[in-house]
């Protein structure tokens, strides 16, 4: 059997290939695992998966009757830190099932996950623990969507090959929507980020997590640093705790800026051996971060300050990019880069003037869709054709005929595009800056689009 370390190495290589490919496509959904460091600050975020949990920590904390999630919140408060809790709805409906083997990835169940443990589902999830999601928000933390049932979006070999999965995008969106509405009805908030169970993106019918998140209006919540606490025990609890602390300590010793702008993965649950080393490791991790001058904030705050991985404060036209992003336009690549010096194509110019709402408007159609037939990737998937159609429908293309999405944008093309949008919006005045070269870079388009759209 292939070991976890080998699988993680393979996965790391695959992620690098996928990330490079994702850097070629502008997308309403960006995979956010880190951001460009905020100027004059050391700042990072921590996410806590699979709760909220009222189960007691294991081993239990002395002189405390708090469940796991409240224990984590107490620790965060003591260190003036804010967390992002990546919550589930409930796994209580994931039966019939059989208990999995302890110390393995199937510890909670053979067909499905069960949190906090098999036949103890009532102790975790927003549905079963509504008071906990309320306390999370009241304490200044954030909530993100980890799936109502925490069922895999699609199959994966090796570790989860016996798991049952969703079959199509209808089921995935329904699952996300159900948890979204559960939280909205309870707290009057709209979650903005989601993370697929076990990071499995592909859905059996050809769609993927990005398509589903576009329909929901989410960004893809990833992570760039593993806080640990999920692997099987070494047989010694204290060693399990130190195994969570050492990598972070090593990273900061080698480079005090190593965690700046990063998102750290944590568990709001037990490891594969039904223990919670997070309880004793988290205070040490937070103390280390404080020693090096870090602020630990919610993912919402981190991304609001610095939306992209390669483009940030102090760079020419960054403020315009942030304004357009906050206004909901599709301006970043799928891998969360902006690539300011890349030459701008006509397809990208059109996309950057397209709001993400063209996808969320289709969510109701998916929820009410005929489940007997396969959903159309052309109709509901992320594609530049939707952006061109939107631009034409809005009158943004004026009298332009056939569009070549790969054509580099010249001054003449920019003037035609700006003139058409200006006319649609009531002849607003726009200063069109000339490109420094023969055609525009992506950054050079930003102040022009900001004048038009924000």
Describe the role of every protein-language-model region.
Residues 3-196, 288, 303-307, 312-314:
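Active-site beta->alpha N-cap acidic-glycine motif
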Residues 42, 54-55, 59-70, 123-127, ...:
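Soluble non-cytosolic domains of exported or imported proteins
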Residues 305-454:
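N-terminal propeptides
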Residues 69-73, 84-85, 129-133, 173-176, ...:
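Extracytoplasmic/secreted envelope proteins and their assembly/folding machinery
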């Amino acid at each position: 059997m292939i070991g976890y370390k080998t699988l993680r190495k393979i996965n790391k290589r695959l992620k690098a290939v996928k990330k490079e490919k994702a850097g070629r496509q502008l997308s309403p959904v960006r995979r956010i695992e880190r951001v460009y460091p905020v100027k004059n600050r050391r700042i990072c975020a921590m996410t806590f998966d699979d709760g909220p949990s009222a189960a007691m920590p294991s081993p239990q904390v002395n002189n405390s009757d708090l469940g796991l999630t409240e224990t984590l919140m107490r620790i965060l408060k003591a260190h003036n830190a804010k967390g992002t809790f990546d919550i589930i709805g409930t796994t209580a409906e994931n039966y019939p099932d059989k208990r999995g083997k302890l110390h393995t990835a199937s510890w909670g169940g053979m067909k499905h996950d069960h949190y906090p443990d098999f036949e103890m589902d009532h102790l975790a999830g927003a549905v079963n623990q509504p008071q906990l999601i309320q306390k999370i928000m009241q304490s200044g933390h954030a909530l993100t969507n980890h799936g109502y049932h925490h069922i895999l979006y699609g199959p994966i070999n090796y570790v989860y090959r016996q798991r049952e999965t969703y079959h199509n995008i209808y089921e995935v969106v329904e699952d996300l929507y159900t948890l979204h509405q559960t939280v909205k009805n309870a707290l009057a908030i709209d979650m903005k980020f989601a993370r697929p169970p076990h990071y499995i993106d592909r859905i059996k019918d050809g769609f993927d997590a990005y398509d589903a998140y576009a329909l929901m209006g989410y960004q893809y919540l990833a992570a760039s640093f593993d806080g640990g606490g999920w692997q099987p025990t070494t047989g010694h609890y204290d060693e399990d705790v130190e195994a969570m602390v050492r990598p972070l300590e090593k990273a900061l010793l080698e480079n005090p800026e190593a965690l700046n702008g990063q998102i750290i993965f944590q568990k709001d649950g037990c490891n594969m051996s039904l223990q919670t080393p997070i309880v004793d490791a988290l205070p040490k991790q937070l103390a280390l971060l404080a020693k090096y001058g870090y602020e630990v904030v919610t993912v919402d705050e981190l991304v609001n300050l610095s939306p992209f991985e390669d483009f940030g404060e102090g760079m020419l036209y960054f403020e315009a990019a942030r304004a357009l992003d906050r206004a909901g336009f599709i301006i970043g690549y799928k891998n969360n880069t902006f690539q300011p010096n890349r030459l701008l194509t006509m397809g990208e110019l059109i996309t950057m003037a397209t709001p993400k709402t063209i996808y969320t408007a289709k969510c109701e159609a998916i929820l009410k869709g005929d489940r007997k037939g396969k959903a159309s990737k052309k109709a509901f998937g992320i594609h530049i054709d939707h952006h061109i159609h939107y631009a034409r429908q809005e009158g943004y293309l004026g009298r332009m005929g056939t569009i070549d999405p790969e054509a580099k944008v010249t001054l003449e093309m920019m003037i035609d595009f700006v003139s058409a949008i200006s006319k649609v919006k009531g002849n607003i005045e726009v200063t069109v800056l000339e490109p420094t070269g023969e055609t525009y870079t992506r950054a050079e388009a930003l102040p022009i689009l900001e004048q038009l759209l924000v």
